[in-house]
């Protein structure tokens, strides 16, 4: 800083030297006026003594962007554009991506994992902003394996130390219902199959909430259950015209993919509705099945809180009696009305050797027969040692 000179414009004495490329110049720190510019080199000696300054060094852009990061940034923006996310989401996703790629842990990973990192950063942003989207949707867009995506997602959340809230089920249901073509005002939809989006979404939300309260959603992918609930809700408005339409045809007319577990979720949901229907007085006298239960969906959803309390009260009353029938699996399922599917229908575990009846309680103190011991004696040395031990025991 030079105290003798003053700025001719503002009179300030705050004069600093600023290096502009290879030339030095005096600049006023207050108003930015240039007092003197550096001289251009005119002699050979001056040109040989000076060194060229790179543009990145002179402008402060020392951090070079690699090809992989440039490609990843483009992929993040493309994925956000496909999902039609707001501009603020794009900036947040790019920030997370740059932080993740800059870590040594993800610097030398495979191309497949780098693509999954792009999806994870976008998915984290959507979850934080309560944007209804599932992990399966991201995986289908980037052609990634769900298991690998889930493991990398958990790792990135822990490494970046970000808070990821849970998905709002109501928003997810409404967002998924918007993708059904039958719920849109379109001339291509048959009149008997067309339905208003708001009406179907409201009933679908109530049906999914009922499934959640009866353990049909916990620990499972939500999209198959939402698809089954939307199908039942759509049928319930005009049962006479829509009962003949199958779930696969419904998804085909709606121009959406049918997840494979949707048929199983539909069956479970119908069985749950039948169990609840037996607690309504005007439905007890009817012969209900999986086909005609849809006609009474509105009544079941209207009185679902009362029906769930009655079902729980009946279950507690039967359990308090201590009936001997509780040991039977079939009668157990009829007594305990609502259980998680993993408890009501457990998968059979394969066993290499079946245990004989009555020998399930193994303590480790059982006697070992001589023939079984001989199976473990393979070499002559082991036989000799065994004979010596037996002789010592007999001599004692």
From Swiss-Prot:
Gene3D superfamilies: 2.20.25.10, Cyclin-like (1.10.472.10). Component of TFIIIB complexes. Interacts with TBP and forms a ternary complex with TBp and target DNA sequences. It is found in: Nucleus. The modification Cysteine sulfenic acid (-SOH) is found at residue 342. It comes from Xenopus laevis (African clawed frog). In response to oxidative stress, a Cys-residue is reversibly oxidized to cysteine sulfenic acid. This impairs formation of a ternary complex with TBP and DNA and down-regulates expression of target genes in response to oxidative stress. One of its GO terms (biological process) is regulation of transcription by RNA polymerase III. CDD domains: CYCLIN_BRF2 (cd20555). This is Transcription factor IIIB 50 kDa subunit. Sequence repeats lie at residues 173-249. The keyword Transmembrane does not apply. One of its GO terms (molecular function) is RNA polymerase III type 3 promoter sequence-specific DNA binding. One of its GO terms (cellular component) is nucleus. A zinc finger (TFIIB-type) spans 3-36. General activator of RNA polymerase III transcription. Factor exclusively required for RNA polymerase III transcription of genes with promoter elements upstream of the initiation sites. Contributes to the regulation of gene expression; functions as activator in the absence of oxidative stress. Down-regulates expression of target genes in response to oxidative stress. Overexpression protects cells against apoptosis in response to oxidative stress. Pfam families: BRF2-like_C_cyclin_rpt, Zn_Ribbon_TF. Keywords: Activator, Metal-binding, Nucleus, Oxidation, Repeat, Transcription, Transcription regulation, Zinc, Zinc-finger. Disulfide bonds: none annotated. The keyword Transcription applies. Belongs to the TFIIB family. The gene is brf2. Zn(2+) binds at residues 7, 10, 28, 31.
């Amino acid at each position: 800083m030079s105290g003798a000179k003053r700025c001719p414009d503002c009179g300030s004495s705050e004069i600093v030297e600023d290096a502009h490329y290879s030339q030095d110049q005096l600049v006023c720190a207050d108003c930015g006026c240039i007092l003197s510019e550096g001289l251009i080199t005119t002699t050979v000696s001056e040109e040989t003594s000076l060194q060229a300054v790179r543009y990145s060094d002179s402008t402060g852009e020392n951090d070079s962007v690699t090809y992989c990061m440039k490609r990843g940034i483009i992929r993040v923006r493309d994925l956000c554009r496909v999902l039609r996310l707001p501009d603020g989401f794009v900036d947040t996703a790019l920030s997370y991506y740059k932080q993740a790629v800059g870590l040594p842990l993800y610097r030398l990973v495979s191309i497949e994992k780098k693509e999954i990192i792009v999806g994870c950063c976008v998915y984290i942003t959507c979850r934080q902003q309560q944007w209804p989207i599932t992990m399966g949707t991201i995986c289908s867009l980037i052609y990634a394996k769900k298991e690998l995506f889930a493991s990398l997602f958990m790792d990135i959340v822990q490494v970046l130390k970000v808070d990821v809230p849970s998905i709002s089920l109501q928003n997810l249901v409404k967002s998924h219902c918007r993708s059904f073509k039958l719920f849109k005002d379109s001339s291509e939809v048959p009149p008997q199959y067309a339905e208003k989006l708001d009406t179907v979404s409201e009933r679908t939300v109530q049906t999914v909430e009922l499934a959640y309260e009866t353990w049909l959603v916990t620990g499972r992918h939500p999209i198959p259950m939402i698809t089954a609930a939307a199908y039942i809700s759509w049928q319930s408005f005009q049962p006479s015209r829509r009962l003949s339409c199958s779930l696969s045809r419904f998804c085909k007319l709606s121009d959406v993919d049918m997840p494979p577990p949707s048929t199983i979720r539909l069956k479970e949901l119908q069985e749950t509705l039948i169990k609840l229907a037996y607690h309504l007085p005007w439905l007890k006298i009817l012969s209900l099945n999986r086909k005609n239960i849809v006609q009474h969906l509105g009544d079941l959803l209207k009185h679902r809180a009362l029906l769930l309390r009655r079902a729980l009260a009946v279950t507690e009353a039967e359990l308090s009696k201590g009936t001997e029938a509780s040991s039977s699996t079939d009668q157990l399922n009829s007594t305990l009305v609502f259980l998680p599917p993993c408890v009501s229908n457990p998968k059979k575990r394969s066993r290499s050797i079946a245990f004989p009846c009555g020998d399930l309680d193994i303590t480790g103190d059982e006697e070992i027969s001589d023939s079984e011991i001989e199976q473990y004696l393979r070499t002559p040395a082991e036989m000799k040692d065994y004979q010596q031990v037996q002789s010592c025991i007999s001599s004692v």
